[in-house]
């Protein structure tokens, strides 16, 4: 695990950030937390469409699990009322447990899938659950030859995507 974390830190240090892509929330089924599975064209040469969609669908599944109301959620609510919410000083809620599972999954995906392709997935919790942010990195040694071709295309996409993520 230490070498995998080292690789993510190495990616941030040795590569320059080219652009960011934002995957927006999908409100087609109401306000439940889910993200669009539409493949962004900026990632076309970086990651296979199937891997991207599988990752987003897995995240959507985790968020559905977190928001699912079951017996344990009902019991948590009853205990919270009975203890004036002091119970949450001693235990994690079901939602918090699933959010930790999501963070571990994102870390694992970054190490195994995204970082080797020069990409970095940001936990949606860090962006207020509004977007999934994917940072696209370029090698500093190869950025001189490819920066002129990618700067015109990525400049317009990062300007549009940056506005959506900054709101």
Curated annotation (Swiss-Prot):
Q: What is its main location?
A: membrane
Location relative to the cell: Cell membrane; Golgi apparatus membrane
Q: Identify the stretch(es) annotated as Disordered.
A: 140-167
Q: Which domain of life is it from?
A: Eukaryota
User: In what ranges is there compositional bias, type Gly residues?
Assistant: 158-167
In this record, what's one Pfam family?
A: Erf4
Q: Which keywords are on file for this protein?
A: Cell membrane, Golgi apparatus, Lipoprotein, Membrane, Palmitate
Biological function: Play a role in cell adhesion by regulating the plasma membrane localization of the palmitoyltransferase ZDHHC5. May be involved in protein transport from Golgi to cell surface.
| Protein name in UniProt | Golgin subfamily A member 7B
Query: What gene name does this entry carry?
Result: GOLGA7B
């Amino acid at each position: 695990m230490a070498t995998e974390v080292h690789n993510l830190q190495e990616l941030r240090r040795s590569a320059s950030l080219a652009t960011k892509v934002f995957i927006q929330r999908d409100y087609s089924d109401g306000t439940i937390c889910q993200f669009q599975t539409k493949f962004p064209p900026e990632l076309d040469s970086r990651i296979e469409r199937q891997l991207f969609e599988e990752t987003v669908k897995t995240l959507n599944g985790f968020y559905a699990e977190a928001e699912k109301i079951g017996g344990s959620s009902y019991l948590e609510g009853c205990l919270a009322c009975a203890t004036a919410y002091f119970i949450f000083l001693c235990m994690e809620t079901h939602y918090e447990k699933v959010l930790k599972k999501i963070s571990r999954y994102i870390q694992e995906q970054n190490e195994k899938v995204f970082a080797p392709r020069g990409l970095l997935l940001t936990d949606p919790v860090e962006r207020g659950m509004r977007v999934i942010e994917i940072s696209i990195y370029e090698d500093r040694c190869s950025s001189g030859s490819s920066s002129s071709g990618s700067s015109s295309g990525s400049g317009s996409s990062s300007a549009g995507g940056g506005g959506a993520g900054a709101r």
